[in-house]
Amino acid sequence: MRDIVIIGHKAKTSGDFSLNDLPGSAGRMDILCRCVSSALFLSFGMRRDVNVHLLLLGEPEPGKIIRFEGLHLRYLNPDERSSGSLIQKALQKTVTEKDIRSTPGVWVRNGDLNTLLASFEGRTLFYLREDGEDIRGLDREIRDPVFILGDHMGVTEEEEKQLLEAGAKIISVGPISLHSNHCITLLHNELDRAEAERGEIPGGEKLRAGE
Amino acid sequence: MRDIVIIGHKAKTSGDFSLNDLPGSAGRMDILCRCVSSALFLSFGMRRDVNVHLLLLGEPEPGKIIRFEGLHLRYLNPDERSSGSLIQKALQKTVTEKDIRSTPGVWVRNGDLNTLLASFEGRTLFYLREDGEDIRGLDREIRDPVFILGDHMGVTEEEEKQLLEAGAKIISVGPISLHSNHCITLLHNELDRAEAERGEIPGGEKLRAGE
């Protein structure tokens, strides 16, 4: 399983935004939409072994978590508006601390970074930062990872502190600073290559076959 | 310089589509929009050393080429709707075989794959196909490349014939078939790493500094 967390510092936490203006009205929700698409799509299908966790910290109710589960996901197309629409539907739900299913494979609840980190106890955490250790030296060791990425604002000092306390390792994907969705594509590629080398089938094909 | 060609087999060739429905009304223009964004954006700025060539083959006037020049580009944001809007503006121009500037850094003309290939004479062409040679064995040799990618329909037999006749080398970016925009991110990363190893500054920073 690959879990990917993206922190949206300004991303709206109510569904009253316009799908025609995801960058403006929805607090740079376009960034999160592109991350969802990069995390989940293969050329002909979905990555079944991936969960995406969007941590939304914008107004009016900072601290909501939307989870996309590749294994159960439906109604998602690769365009930004499609993931934006599923996010909007999830934000129209009345949420509590407990998971509520919005659409197939999409879940929403209240929570913050600590909530998420607690749910990953025992997993290996990797926090993406441009000066981190190059993933190319590590990719053969990485199993069952959780990756944590910031948005256009990066990761705050407070968040970084929480990540390091939780044992996250700092990694990078190349020599220059890239958008989060591009980083996700690069992470997947490293792991796909490592899985293929081990004779496994990348992208969770086995899971799909067993559905 | 890195030139990237994406063939949009169904992409509309008039500007009368809705930015609210890039996949449907504009003939999977969403794919081309994501490619533009992946090709041109760095975390804090634009890749100045990249040109993107969209070959639009959909109705009503199949055979238009829109070129985005990283060095001169303005008004582009990373969201799909932003590149969709610049494409739409270009398609609203009356075009001929000669380049017409639509907005800063965006040019449009009539043409087909052969027109494009002729304009790259002397350059090294790389055609992306999932069973191609792995770029990781080649990346240190690649200078001044032109990459050619298909859309959701891939590349037709006829196009492939033209590409091979023009001397294109078939390469791949990993063990599984990916969306074109993800392939572009992976191509850039390989070249960025090779440039960094050679002590160059990836992303065309030198060009930017000299503007």
Swiss-Prot record, chains A, B:
Subcellular location: Cytoplasm
Functional summary from the UniProt entry: Specifically catalyzes the N1-methylation of pseudouridine at position 54 (Psi54) in tRNAs.
Positions that bind S-adenosyl-L-methionine: L128, G150, C183
Homology family: Belongs to the methyltransferase superfamily. TrmY family.
EC number(s) given by UniProt: 2.1.1.257
CDD domains for this protein: TrmY-like
Predominant cellular place of this UniProt entry's protein: cytoplasm
NCBIfam families named in the record: PRK02135.1
GO molecular-function terms, A-Z: S-adenosylmethionine-dependent methyltransferase activity; tRNA methyltransferase activity
Organism the protein comes from: Methanosarcina acetivorans (strain ATCC 35395 / DSM 2834 / JCM 12185 / C2A)
Record protein name field: tRNA (pseudouridine(54)-N(1))-methyltransferase
Keywords: Cytoplasm, Methyltransferase, S-adenosyl-L-methionine, Transferase, tRNA processing
Gene Ontology CC terms, in alphabetical order: cytoplasm
Upper lineage: Archaea, Methanobacteriati, Methanobacteriota, Stenosarchaea group, Methanomicrobia
A GO BP annotation: tRNA methylation
InterPro entries: Alpha/beta_knot_MTases, TrmY, tRNA_m1G_MTases_N
Substrates-to-products reaction catalysed: pseudouridine(54) in tRNA + S-adenosyl-L-methionine = N(1)-methylpseudouridine(54) in tRNA + S-adenosyl-L-homocysteine + H(+)
Quaternary structure note: Homodimer.
Top enzyme class: transferase
HAMAP family xrefs: tRNA_methyltr_TrmY
